[in-house]
Amino acid sequence: METEKIIRLSVRNLVEFILKEGDIDNRISGTLDKDAMLMGGRLHRKIQRMMGSNYQAEVSLKLQLPCDGFQLKLEGRADGILLESEKTIIDEIKGVVRSLDRVEHPVPVHLAQAKCYAYIYARQQGLKQISVQMTYCNLDTEDVKRFREEYTFEELEKWFLDLVHQYERWAKLQIEWEKRRDASIHQTEFPFAYREGQFDLAASVYRTIYHKKKLFIQASTGTGKTMAVLYPAVKAIGEGLGDKLFYLTAKTITRTVAEQAFSILEEKGLAFRSITLTAKEKICFCEETECNPDACPYAKGHFDRVNDAVYDMLEKQKKLTRESIERQAEDFHVCPFELSLDLSEWADGVICDYNYVFDPTAHLKRFFADNVSGDYLFLIDEAHNLVERGREMYSASIYKEDILEVKKLMKDRDKKLVKSLESVNKLMLEMKRECENYRLVESVSPFAVKLMNLLTQMERYLEEERNAGNAEQPDAFMELFFQVRQFLEIHELLDENYIQYTELEGNGRFKIKLFCVNPAENLNHYLKLGNSTIFFSATLLPIDYYKQLLSVEKDDYAVYAESKFPQGNRKILIGSEASTKYTQRGTEMYRKIADYLRSTVDGKNGNYIAFFPSYQFMEDVLEEFEKRSSGVELVIQSQFMSENQREEFLEMFEEERDHPMLGFCVMGGVFSEGIDLTHDRLIGVIVVGTGIPQVCNEREIVKNYFDQRGMRGFDYAYLYPGMNKVLQSAGRVIRTEDDKGIILLLDDRFQNRQYQHLFPREWKEYEVCGWKEIKEKMEEFWENQ
């Protein structure tokens, strides 16, 4: 007998999905987000404590309900349950900035959520009657207004089952799709002949998912890692080991690789709904991204129409491409970005940026709010990027100058707001006087308290302005508003992984920063909501460093997948006479590096790229190279290139060329990672320098943090991030088994064991030479090809 499908859903998602209506209006929703408005739960907890000993706070509730052809498993958390003499009351707490006099009745979705909790609790406890209490609290005055309604169990059951019945048609549609999907997964074979080692890699991924573990994969170019990770993950979904995979990337170009892999599998017969989430600013139909019904016609009535748009796409089994989503949004007159988010709930695979999962201010609440776990598989591509991205996502700063600017803007507009800004500014001024360069601070809690008051005043001001018809506010005000909100959210996360400090920057600006040095704990908060995680990259070296900063588990798996490309196709040279140390920099060294470059490109006509540690260093060497560049075509990366300019730059790398062309680029920039110049489009890479970041306060904080914990602080702060840039830059050449090319490392430090210890295994054969030997070495290599 076939086991009935179990569909898991949070109570919040159920009511918001079925009962949503009206307009998109970020002037309301953007400022009335529950977590932000309750300032990390401070006021929430205060109200709960005031309710006495008969009040149970944060009660988890679950219900598995038999439906037509499936089981619905609902999960949620009631803010409180109050036992009052013979009455049972479900309490739902919401924060508001408006005057409580204007809150005349509960918001329908809020009430529906509480009624669901009431039904579940009454059903489980065998209650004939139960009350629902909506508690609204003004964040400025902390005044409270309550609405209480009593229901019989029969009333709640009738209402609840009707709600579930409205959901059933969606569930049935999904179940039918999953049957088709799983049947196709079972018959879909690996789309290529397995390369050497590729089957073992795919098997490692499947085993990891089966055991619900994490896996770190160092997979050099040529191992076919994308398909070796994606295919077993899809297979695992077909075996019920997961119900949705998230393919997470740091850059747009990597998303394209994932899309191509899905397309290849679909050509082999796979039925699998995959969707790529495009940033709101890119997919928006309007010139300005203003999400409210006054500025955007697609926002007006969006929620009245969007479910029909989603159901139509799913029922007709339309492909969830950006183009089809934009067409559907036009046809149904809805926001394309919000439509894509709704469709992602019904997709089997979601390709998106890291921040949709990990960023506390931008993650997809429909999947990751309320701490409700799901059978998710996380595939994290180019995972070496997640350390710095994690630090950025879980850190926050406030600048004194921004506070002062907004204070001046508000001077004649709102006295209470100005007073709050003045209070924050005064405290920052005191802290600034104690700071010469940067200063570690034991606690910024007094500052956070003042920011809480400021946020409340800003919320109140925005609400009053909106009610008066003044929706538009100065950019500086709104930017500070979001910065304050983020700072307070991050403040709630503070633990031993953080350093709090103040800094007087070189330009005179003063900031207070909450710096997440080790993001592993915060990342794990989201990863544990899924079943399994695969971290993979061509430059995940040393793996122990990444395991330390990306995971909190001690028993994670790790695999090193070596490239099986012929060793003879690659020539690795280390320039013994070059150095990028600050003490060695100057005209003489720039000339020497220019000589190395010239000798390299003279070895064979074709396309080369030289990667430099900074734009300034690149320009200094370029000035010398131009004196000896006769017959060499130059193409140069500039700062702040547009998408079109980047494409034009890459188009210069044609396969056929009867003279040398040399690109001047910067390590860590857009051309040092993710670009795929195969065959003769690129035959050589010169990496100038070790990639070590410049010494700065934040790097020193990282160094000292790990030194104090008995770990190699210099390596964590400087060496490992620098060598990652080197490996990424060098990885631009030799992308397929037929490619042939050279890698020249220009810095005498590459001869040191400290650096060679971080070379991938494929680099075990290299030669050290001076610039006068380079041309001969090049010619010898190319003659043997």
Regions from the language model: what does each represent?
Residues 1-86:
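Metal-dependent nuclease catalytic cores that hydrolyze phosphodiester bonds in DNA/RNA
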Residues 63-157:
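Mg2+/Mn2+-dependent nuclease catalytic core
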Residues 176-218:
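Conserved pre-motif I regulatory segment
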Residues 188, 241-350, 358, 437-442, ...:
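A substrate-engagement module of RecA-like helicase motors
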Residues 210-232:
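Walker A/P-loop
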Residues 229, 256, 332-349, 353-459, ...:
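Signature of the SF2 helicase/ATPase Hel1-core->accessory helical subdomain module
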Residues 325-350, 361-368, 461-579, 584, ...:
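A contiguous, basic/glycine-rich beta-loop/short-helix subdomain that forms a polymer-engagement track
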Residues 576-588, 638-751:
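Conserved RecA-like P-loop NTPase helicase motor core
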